[in-house]
A protein has these predicted regions:
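Adenine-nucleotide phosphate-binding core of ATP-dependent small-molecule kinases
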Residues: 212-255
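Short beta-strand-loop/turn "lid" adjacent to the catalytic site in phosphate-handling enzymes
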Residues: 61-107, 112-129
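Glycine-rich phosphate-binding/hydrolytic loop that grips phosphoryl groups
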Residues: 289-315
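Glycine-rich phosphate-binding loop plus the immediately following alpha-helix
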Residues: 38-40, 121-214
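Short glycine-rich phosphate-binding loop at a beta-alpha junction
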Residues: 65-79, 156, 249, 260-269
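N-terminal phosphate-binding loop and adjacent alpha-helix
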Residues: 29-68, 78-81, 85, 190-193, ...
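Glycine-rich phosphate-binding loops at beta-strand->alpha-helix junctions
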Residues: 14, 261-278, 296
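Short glycine-rich, Thr/Ser-proximal phosphate-binding strand/loop in the N-terminal lobe
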Residues: 5-47, 289, 293
Length: 315
């Protein structure tokens, strides 16, 4: 028999809430805000629950749901700046979700008594993540990659590389690609010469030059060229932005060329284009980008897997 649940992805700077129906995994409504965890200031421990109740009440269709349907929350809500700090689950991490640390927080409020299930993050001996564990569980399930050796790349401010094999995530590694781009273009001398491109159209040569520079000279050795390309070569800021993107992606992707796995990148649009083009230039043949539908369903699918396991059913 089908039932519904709320899927909440609550990051540092963004909030996303969806009403999901099982077993179809149909998202019947959703709501997004820029109210990340770090924006809910104050010492009142009830502020997180109050915020969630307000958002659930705004969610189309929520008034038709039973008041006790589960609410799954992942992301920074389980961090030291969040709702309740939870320890990280450890590698190896089973892809059926059975290794996840889930805290049952009880009813959200008296007026909205949804049972709250807070999901912790994941750690290795020297790296951590929060939120991406749920996304990875969902994506690998949707892609049918729960047994095959797979390198899953989750781009972002901090790009996460998760190695999966034989039904578990065995390693993780973080690349600060997005944050480095932001720092370099906003706070370094390169801010005067670089503009972020919205597309690779007409900029592929500059992007490829950046990828090749990274492979040849290394990241540090290729950075200043983003300035000299304009000062000496008269290149436009968008071209330099494409060059810098290629340089940074070269540094991120080059180690992946030796992993021996099929590689899946959770990105569409210009970001997906950049990963594919950089991989081609670096001779990485077994890289695919994830389609938009699976990207959209990744977190709800991860929560659905955890919900199934939480109820004690076979995964």
């Amino acid at each position: 028999m089908g039932h519904s649940f709320y899927s909440c992805d609550w990051g540092t700077s963004n909030f996303r809430l969806r009403l999901v129906h099982l077993p179809s995994l149909e998202v019947t409504s959703e709501l997004r805000t820029a109210d990340g965890i770090d924006r809910l200031e104050g010492d009142d421990p009830g502020r997180f629950a109050s915020y969630l109740v307000d958002r659930i009440n705004e969610l189309p269709g929520s008034e038709d749901q039973a008041s006790e349907i589960p609410l799954w929350v992942s992301g920074m809500a389980s961090s030291s700046i969040g709702w309740r700090e939870l320890d990280y689950a450890r590698l190896p991490f089973p892809l059926d979700g059975s290794g996840a640390i889930v805290a049952a927080l009880g009813a959200l409020t008296e007026s909205r008594p949804c049972p709250v299930r807070l999901v912790s993050g994941l750690r290795s001996e020297d790296d951590v993540l929060r939120g991406e564990e749920t996304e990875a569980l969902g994506l690998l399930k949707l892609l049918g990659r729960t047994e095959e050796e797979t390198l899953l790349i989750l781009p972002g401010t901090h790009s996460k590389h998760l190695q999966a094999r034989e039904g578990e995530i065995s390693s993780l590694r973080t690349f600060m690609t997005g944050e480095l781009y932001a720092i370099l273009t906003q706070h370094s001398i390169l801010r005067h010469t670089v503009e972020e491109p919205e597309t690779l159209a007409g900029l592929e040569d500059a992007f490829v030059e950046g990828v090749r520079s990274g492979a040849r000279d290394g990241l540090s050795g290729g950075l200043f060229a983003a300035r000299t390309r304009q000062v000496l070569g008269g290149k436009e800021p968008r071209e330099n932005g494409a060059y810098l993107s290629g340089l940074l992606l070269s540094a991120e992707l080059e180690p992946a060329g030796n992993c021996g796995s099929d590689i899946f990148v959770a990105a569409a649009g210009v970001v997906g284009d950049m990963y594919r083009r950089a991989a081609t230039e670096l001779g990485i043949e077994r890289l695919e980008t994830v389609d938009e539908r699976n990207l959209e369903l990744s977190v709800p699918a991860g929560h659905a897997l955890l919900e199934k396991n939480f109820q004690g059913e076979a995964s």
